[in-house]
From Swiss-Prot:
Source taxonomy: Bacteria, Pseudomonadati, Pseudomonadota, Gammaproteobacteria, Enterobacterales
One of the Pfam families matching this protein, by short name: MutS_I
Cross-referenced PANTHER family: DNA MISMATCH REPAIR PROTEIN MSH1, MITOCHONDRIAL, DNA MISMATCH REPAIR PROTEIN MUTS FAMILY MEMBER
Gene (UniProt): mutS
The protein, known as: DNA mismatch repair protein MutS
Record function comment: This protein is involved in the repair of mismatches in DNA. It is possible that it carries out the mismatch recognition step. This protein has a weak ATPase activity.
InterPro entries cross-referenced by the UniProt entry: DNA_mismatch_repair_MutS, DNA_mismatch_repair_MutS-lik_N, DNA_mismatch_repair_MutS/MSH, DNA_mismatch_repair_MutS_C, DNA_mismatch_repair_MutS_clamp, DNA_mismatch_repair_MutS_core, DNA_mismatch_repair_MutS_N, DNA_mismatch_repair_MutS_sf
Keyword Repeat belongs to the record: no
NCBIfam families: mutS1, PRK05399.1
Gene Ontology biological process: mismatch repair
Residues annotated for ATP binding in this entry: G616, P617, N618, M619, G620, G621, K622, S623
Amino acid sequence: MSKIIMNKKNNDTPMIKQYLSLKLHYPNMFLFYRLGDFYELFFDDAKRISLMLDITLTKRGYSSQKEIPMAGIPYTSLNRYLSKLLKIGESAVICEQTHIIDKRTGLIERKISRVVTPGTVIDEEFLSETKNNLLGSVYYSKKRFGYATLDLCSGNFYISEYDTFESFISELQRTDPEELLIQEDFLYMNFFEKRKGIRLCKLNDFNIDSAYQQLKCHFKTKNLKSFGVYQNNLAISAAGCLLKYLKFIQYSLLPHVKSIKVRYDCNHIFMNSATRKNLEIINNISGKKEHTLLSILDNTATPMGGRLLRKWLSAPIKDIKIINKRHNIIKSLKTVYMSLSLLLKGIGDLERIISRIACRSASPKDFVSMRSALLQFSKIIFVLNSTKSKTLELISCKIKEYNSILILLRRSLKVCPSKTIKEGNVISENYNKDLDKWRKIANNASEYLQYFEVSERKRLHITSLKVNNNRVLGYYVQISKKDIKLAPNNYKKIQTLKHCVRYSTLELLDYENNVNNAKDKVLEIENYLYNELFDFIIPYIDSLKISVNTISELDVLNNLTERACVLNYVCPVISDEYGILLTDSRHPVVENLLKTPFVKNSINLSKSSNMLIITGPNMGGKSTYMRQIALIVIMAYIGSFVPAKYARIGLCDKIFTRIGSADNLAYGESTFMMEMIEMSSILRNSTSNSLVLIDELGRGTSMHDGLSLAWACIEYLAGKINAMTLFSTHYFELTKLKNYYSNIRNMYFDVLEHNNEIVFTYVIKNGFINKSYGLVVAALAKLPKCILLSAKKKLKEFYP
C-alpha cells in the first residue's frame, strides 16, 4: 500500500503537490502521471513498480528534504505495462495533461482519464479470449456468504448465497474472478493471502439499504422482485458493494447490464475444489491447459463459444429437458457442422464487441469486426433452415439479420481504418460531403506545393527554387546560396544551411493555416460521425445480445457435434432413474494421448450394486478408470455425446473425489490431514445420488489406522449414504465387506504373469486380486538391483 504524506509546510513543487493531491484519492493503485512524452510514477509507486516490472528507478527533486524516487515509461508503451500489471492483480490510474493553467509556473492541468483494474477492463488487448473476465464481491455475516459477480464484457450479473465456507469456495474457484472485493474484517482472510486482485472494502460499503437503493436506481425499478430477487440480503449487499466500487473507478454508466440473476446451486452438479483439480476438467494438476477435458472438447470457432463451453464444464446442468434438447440439436447438426464451423469462424468475439459499443468504448477495429460478423448471420440462418429440422429452425428464429446496421457499417467505415478515431482515417470517402470537402483541402497540400514551386520558379527565374515542408518549419521555400540574391523582399529568411537558405512567405503561411484548420476539421467531423455509429447501434444492443448468445450456444453445440463425429462418441440416455451404465467406455483425454488403442471398460452402478471396491496393481488402470467414469458423467450433463458404445446415466447431484494428496504446509496440514479433511467433506455432503471416487484412502498413516478408517468409511457410504461409489485400495482386507453389504461388488484390474514379469491388461473384472506388484513397478522404475533384492528378502520375512 502506498504511503501518501501531505505536508503543508514543505517546499514541494506545484507539480508534486498536484501529483500528491491526485494520489490521495487512489492510495492503493499505481498513478501514471503524464509528463510530456512519458508517464511518471513517484514515491512508493516508483519503488514498487521498478521491482515488479523491472523499470529503472531514478530520482527527481526533493520532498520534505528527501529525494523523490521516480520511475517512468514512454507514453507509447503504456498499454504494454498496464497489461503486465493487470496480470499480477494490480490496478492503475491514468492521469493525462489537458492544458496550461499557470503560464508563470508552467503548471499544466491534469485529469484522471481512466482507472484500469483486473476485473473491470473491457479492452481487447487486456483480456483472455478463453476466460470470462469477472469482478467479484463477497459479504460474510452470521456464518453465511453472499456472492456477486459481474462480467462487464457481456453484462452478465449474478448473485448467490451459501451456507458453508466450502460451498462458497467451490463457487469462487468455479467463477475465478480477476478481482474480488471483500470486507476488511473477513473471517477467512488467510485463505486469500496468495490470491491476486483482492480489494479490501469498508464494512459500510456492504450496507444493505444502500445496496438496495443502488440496485433499484441502476435497474430503474421500485423493487427487485421482477428479477427473482427476494430475501437474498447477503448477496444484495455484495452486489451493492460491487456497484459502489464501479462508481469509484468511474464506471457509472453500465447500459448493457440490464438484469441481475440469482444462481441456485441446486440447478447444477456440485463439484468442490478437490474434484475440479483431480479430474483436470479445465486445468491440469500443474495449473496448465494441456491434457484436460476442456482441451479435448474445445474446437469452438469463436472465443465466446469457447468461454461458454468452459462455463458449461465448470457447472454441468441438472435439467434433463435442457440436456436432452442439446443432444437433439447435436443429432440435427451432424449433416451441416462443417459448413457451420466455417461460417462461425467469421463471427469473432462479437459478445465483447457489442459490450464495448454499449459502453461507447469500441475501436474502429471492433466496428470492422462487427461488419464482418453480421455478414455471416444470414448465411448461418440459411444453413440452419436448410436442414428442415424444427429444432434448428427454432435456433435460427433467435438470430436476426440487422441489415440496417450492416448497410451503415459498409457505407461509413473504410476497409482498413486506423486503430483509433483520434488518428482519423476511419470514415469512408463519399459518406459525408463536408468531410470529403475538408479532406480535399487537407490532402491536396502536395499538389498545391508543386503548383506554387513551378509558378515561383517561372516568376523569379530561379531554377534551384524548391518548395517543401517539415514539422519544425512548416511550409518553406528553399533556394541555393548561389541564387539567394534573386530572392524577393517578401521572402522572410527562417533558416540558413551550408548550401541553401530557407524562406517563408505570407501565401505559404496562409495556406499552411488553412491545411491545419482543415485537418482539425476532418478529425472533428470524423469524431462526430463515429459517435453517430454508437447512437445508431446502441438501441439494438438488447436484440444483438440475444442473437450473440444464441450463436455462442450454437458454436458450442456445433463443436460438440464435430467432436462426437471425429472421436466416435455416442448419445447418452439421460433419465431420472438411479445409476450409471456404460458399455465399452473410454477415458476422453487419455485415449487421445495414446499411440495404441485404448482398452475399453464397462460399469453398471444400480441401487442393488452401487459401490465398487477396486483392487489391482499399481499402474494397472484403477485411477484412470475412476476418472473416466466421472468425466463421462460431466460430459453427458453438459449435453455432449460420450466415449462409449452405450451410456445410460441417471440423476447425479454431486461429484466428489479423494484422489492423491499433498501437504498443505502453508496451513500446517499434512498429507494425512488433507486426506481426512477431504473425506470428512464427502461424508457430510454426499447423497445417494452423488458420485464418489476414493483412491487409496488411508495411505498417509500406519497400515492399521489406514485400514480401520477405510473400512469404517466404506461402511458409512454403503450402509447409510448409499452413494454411487468407486473405492480403489491396496488393503485387500476391504474386499471382505462384500460379505456384509449386498450393494458392494469387488472388481479388479487383471495382469498377466510370465517368468517373474507382468503385463498390464488394463481390463476390469469381477472379483479381487491380493497382489499389488509394487516390486515389479519399482523394477520398471529402474531402482537399483541391490535395493530390489533386499526388498524381496524383507517381503518374505514380513509375509512368509
